[in-house]
Design a protein with these regions (language model features):
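Short conserved beta-strand and strand-loop elements enriched in small hydrophobics
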Residues: 46, 72-83, 128-135
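Conserved hydrophobic/aromatic beta-strand scaffold that supports enzyme active sites
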Residues: 45, 60-62, 100-104, 145-147, ...
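C-terminal subregion of chymotrypsin/trypsin-like serine protease catalytic domains
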Residues: 2-4, 56-65, 175-176, 180-250
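Active-site-proximal beta-strand/loop segments in catalytic clefts of secreted hydrolases
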Residues: 49-51, 56-58, 63-67, 79, ...
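Extracellular/periplasmic catalytic domains that process cell-envelope and extracellular macromolecules
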Residues: 37-41, 55, 93-97, 122-126, ...
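Catalytic histidine site
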Residues: 38-75, 87-95, 197-199
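Secretory targeting and sorting signals
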Residues: 1-28
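Chymotrypsin/trypsin-fold serine protease catalytic domain
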Residues: 96-175, 198-221
Length: 250
């Protein structure tokens, strides 16, 4: 396996449950492999606000709350497994609990991916293994990824008692700045976003998105988009145009 970095930038430490040490700012993931051209999950991973995020519909990015202010601050957006695409975002929304945010694309902008990842609606279980993706915010030319095993589930008072969990990398990887908000996919479903990590040999902490599925649905409904919960994501603009008769009904 080639030695590269994955990246986990962090604005604040996370206080973990009794059996876990409090974690300071994330320090990037090393020893991770670059993704292959046929990695279907990698194509939706983006760089936004100096952190990692995931395009979950044509107009919305799932990311980490601590990377963004809550409001209309614009952020540069890079897409593609070699970060060749450039766009912009318009507004960020914070989940009521957990280190979770949704970032809306700029007006008249939209992703054009063939598909969008399915979101997990159940919390992960200890022992499950998933694939983590994250961008270092400076050096990587190609998106890195790593295998990680779920260990402990806990609730974090720093994020209104939000549901969190820890994972241990199985391939010697560990975090570096830029990975915050990076997705962990378990059985092909987006299960969590990276929140905090402290370095080599220590667990990575993720926000459990299943705890905020209803908030995600309600927030995305602002422009008619719907998350993929097993039936594919819905483009709110296309839905509106179909209702108006400008596009054929599906």
């Amino acid at each position: 396996m080639s030695i590269n970095k994955i990246a986990l930038s962090l604005a604040a430490a996370v206080t973990v449950a009794t059996s876990i040490i409090a974690t300071p700012s994330a320090q990037a993931v090393q020893n991770a492999a670059p993704v292959s051209d046929d990695d279907a999950l990698a194509k939706n991973v983006v760089i936004v606000g100096g952190c990692t995020g995931t395009a979950i519909s044509p107009h919305w990015i799932l990311a980490a709350k601590h990377c963004f202010g809550n409001g209309t601050t614009a952020h540069m957006l890079h897409t593609g497994v070699e970060k060749t695409g450039v766009d912009g975002t318009e507004e960020a929304y914070h989940a009521p609990t957990g280190d979770i945010a949704l970032v809306r694309m700029s007006t008249h902008s939209a992703f054009t991916f063939d598909s969008y990842p399915e979101l997990a609606t159940e919390e992960p279980k200890s022992g499950q293994v998933g694939t983590f993706y994250g961008w270092d915010n400076t050096s990587h030319k190609r998106l890195p990824h790593s295998q990680a095993e779920v260990k402990n589930l806990y609730q974090n008072g720093s994020y209104n008692n939000g549901k969190m969990y820890t994972v241990h990398h199985k391939d010697g990887a560990y975090a570096q700045p830029g990975d915050s908000g990076g997705p962990l996919f378990i059985d092909g479903k987006l299960s969590g976003v990276a929140s905090a990590i402290s370095g080599n040999g220590t667990p990575m902490n993720l926000a459990d998105i299943s705890a905020e599925i209803n908030w995600i649905k309600q927030t995305m409904a602002r422009n008619g988009d719907e998350p993929n919960l097993g039936n594919g994501a819905v483009n709110g603009m296309d839905k509106l145009l179909r209702l108006k008769g400008f596009l054929p009904r599906a």
